[in-house]
Amino acid sequence: MKTIDMKYLRLLAKEYPTIAKTATEIINLEAIMNLPKGTEHFLSDVHGEYSAFEQVLRNGSGVVKRKIRDIFGAELDDAEINSLSTLIYYPEEKMDLIASETEDLHAWYRTTLFRLIELCQYVASKYTRSKVRKAMPEDFAYILEELLHENYNEDDKKLYYEEILQHIISLGRAEEFISALSLLIQQLVVDHLHIVGDVYDRGPYPDKIMDTLMNYHSLDFQWGNHDILWMGAASGSRVCAANVIRISARYLNLDILEDSYGISLRPLALFADEVYKDDPCTYFQPKNEENINYSNAEITQIARMHKAISIIQFKLEGEIIKRRKEFDMNHRLLLQFIDYKKGTIQLKGKEYQLLDNHFPTINPENPYELTDAERELIGKITAAFKNCRRLQKHVQFLYSKGSMFLTYNGNLLYHGCIPLHKDGTFMEMKLRGEKYAGRALLEQFEILTREAYVRPTGTKEKKYACDIVWYLWTGAISSLFGKSEMTTFERYFVAEKETHTEEKNPYYKLRNNELICKQILEEFELDGECGHIINGHTPVKEGKGESPIKASGKMLVIDGGFAKAYHKETNLAGYTLLFNSYGLQLVSHQPFTTKEDAIKNETDILSTRQVIEMEINRKRVRDTDIGAKLSEQAEDLKLLLDAYRNGLLHENR
């Protein structure tokens, strides 16, 4: 048994002043540690696709329906199971539909309430009463506790429960009670949620996803490359703000900025209409992946805005590269290699014709210098990001719940990669005069990302940290990017595909190697034999035979594939992961239709479950990180108990 400072024991004695209270708490802790481990749910790369995200979150990647089958599989047919599942996912909307179609609504309420109570009892059985009580809505907490923690099939209790339910129905509270039960079931089937990066990107509703996550009961977040871009913009990085707007313009998603966050793009529109009024901006036409009905005039204006912000972005990136020699990115100083008279560019020793040679704001003698109008414009845009309350609220949440990586219950979670050389050794990067690699590098990236947000505007520390945030978006040794270079300029201006190549970091080949994965796990102080790496960022091309399970199960790639643009490439809507007391299960998902279809026709995302690892002995809370903390608390309390019994401390009755 460990030794402990008497000063600490005296402090502990204030909370547990008697032998009885100390012993009771030890018993409570031991009981909690013997409960089954809660279910962890892993999602990644949501990319603003709110409808599909909401469905997966509400159905727990199929856990809700599986629990229904466990309880009612012999009693209900598939149609009834689908109906009950949909009710739990979307209780209010589904009840509106049922109310308009059901003749004997009283009987439906009664049957449904009994089923939901029985299901809720089942999913609550692995938790303490205290935890279940905290999850209950206040309005129904007492009644729910009565119904959930007794056996209402016993004769002496049956009438009691019948009366409770009868009064709920007769008082017109059945729908509210059904909603409360449904949401409680949703919450109890998943104990903890991991978002392994990229809520943001081209999808239309990252703001709604963030609102949902902010109301979720228990979660953590590993930042993705697109998240870091928005975090940089919210921190006051001009280049990050320019990148965010460019991507939004490219994918016809400016509504997220103007409508969802209230960031006015009128200054950009006025600037673009003036500077590029005679420019067709042919190669900046936005991609209309959703076939949204825009007028020709609107498309023309967005194309001009797209080009205007892109040129500003390239200039700002050049400024950073020139002042940060340690980034080793001089090969990305492209504007100086353009022959503005001939309309050509020198890339890696070869001359290429530019697709577009209209650069009214570029001074060939000083190509990275912003014009006065550009400087004023990007200043207004950056201020709009910094002053947007809703965005700041979302970004603060990302900082409070997020990190560059996470070790959790023996597993390692990160979005992009661990930068490696071809021989499998960790790549080094110099930051503030010191070299870092592996875990230490990611820790420094996280420190600097946080500094970018909190350091005072105008300080050199703020400027450096914001530059690092941009590097994380685009740099060769960034753990979030994972490629040699980002060839954005070439994709706009050069036709030859050879110039568009972005070579992946050796990590992406080496992660198939079990020894490399064990090496990475051990670098993060995890057991290389038992642990797993949970990785997002790269869509798994199942149609081409790629597997999300790599390195004999050590590496699990769960790019959620929510972005519709990747569905043709992946043959799927991606993967999620479940880790419960029985083991690890990878869930592959087919594309989601719509919320309306799910409610009306009771369609669900078709999901296929694959067991990766089955526990011989069911995992208990004591086998988790929380269990380790509880065990330590119990040991401390045992020492306190000994101190009372040996007369070292006196009880305060």
UniProtKB/Swiss-Prot annotation:
Any idea of its EC number? 3.1.3.11
InterPro entries xrefs? FBPtase_class3, Metallo-depent_PP-like
Which GO BP terms sit in this record? Answer: gluconeogenesis
Task: Cite the entry's keywords alphabetically.
Answer: Carbohydrate metabolism, Hydrolase, Manganese
Q: Which domain of life is it from?
A: Bacteria
Q: Which GO terms describe its molecular function?
A: fructose 1,6-bisphosphate 1-phosphatase activity
- Disulfide bridge partners, by residue number: none
Pathway entry: Carbohydrate biosynthesis; gluconeogenesis
Q: Which reaction does it catalyse?
A: beta-D-fructose 1,6-bisphosphate + H2O = beta-D-fructose 6-phosphate + phosphate
SUPFAM superfamilies listed in its UniProt record: Metallo-dependent phosphatases
Q: What class of enzyme is it?
A: hydrolase
Hydrolase among keywords? yes
Identify which cofactors the protein needs according to its UniProt entry.
Mn(2+)
The record's comment on protein family reads: Belongs to the FBPase class 3 family.
Name this polypeptide is given: Fructose-1,6-bisphosphatase class 3
Lineage, broadest ranks: Bacteria, Bacillati, Bacillota, Bacilli, Bacillales
